[in-house]
Amino acid sequence: MLWLGVNIIFIFLIPILICKSFKLSKYKTILLLLIFITCYPSRMTLNYGQQSLFVMFFMMLPFIFFNKVSSIFSGLSYVKYSTGYIVFLNFLASKQYKYFILASIPYFVGWLIYFSVSSSDPLINFFEPIQLSLKKGYIRDADIFSLINIYFVPAKELYFKLLILLIIFIINFILLIKINKNNDTFFKMSLVFICPLIFFPHSNYDYVLLFPILCYSFLDTEYLINKINICFVLYFFYFNRIINHLIDFDTLYQPILLLFLIGLVITNIYSYKNKDNLYFFNLKFY
């Protein structure tokens, strides 16, 4: 019951904090709050007692509060390392090395406490999350890492998994560098949060990470790219699970969703304001 109460607080706090920080109108704030409360990923997080809302809250702190304290607390997102890793990688990609060190404090404190209390080998504990993930074969079917492990026979070998992991991190890092070339913090947060959904295993409740790009798109709904963003996120929030069950063919359905997600990120990057202050996609619906 305690954890349910914490998740309920987060389900209200996250949309209110985002909308207030980036100055969305009261009407849009209420609408987005209702969407976030009623969407399937949020409800699933509450029902199953998952930590997606907890992780998302601490992930977004450095984008909202530009101080050392928020950077330190952002490190708590690493409790779900397949998602929280993006905080650390983004600090490196944006050359915020001081914040990277600060965000590492919670992890190192937890690591010190754990191996001290358990009297276990500190080196083994430090790399244990990655080791367990590789050996136990933690995969899904809607991300690059999982699909490679499913369809490539050599991926069953540990050395191949390590190689793929390294390549994925490099690609993700390059993508983050591209994202961070923009000056709009809200825009950057929206795309950074999508990266874990593209590169590493996740579940349906992790799609709460799409909420920032929905909020960002509500800032200006005149442009085609924002309309596409809104439709895409609402599909994930309300229709994805239903359509998936009706089709019942994950082998094809999940990779297609992944391609759309990748396309969404790339399209948003190149449709952002260019040096002439014009939108690349400025078509409007009348």
Model regions and ranges:
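Transmembrane alpha-helices and membrane-interface helical segments
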Residues: L13, L17, F57-N67, V87-S94, ...
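Primarily membrane-embedded glycan-assembly and transfer machineries that use lipid-linked glycans
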Residues: M1-V69, S94-F211, Y279-F280
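Short alpha-helical "patches" and their helix-cap loops
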Residues: G5, L76-V79, A103-P106, L224-F232
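Transmembrane-embedded, aromatic-rich helix segments that form part
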Residues: S71-S77, S82-A93, S104, V208-L210
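Short, surface-exposed, charge-dense and proline/glycine-enriched linear segments
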Residues: L33, Y81, V117-S118, K135, ...
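Aromatic-enriched
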Residues: F218-Y286
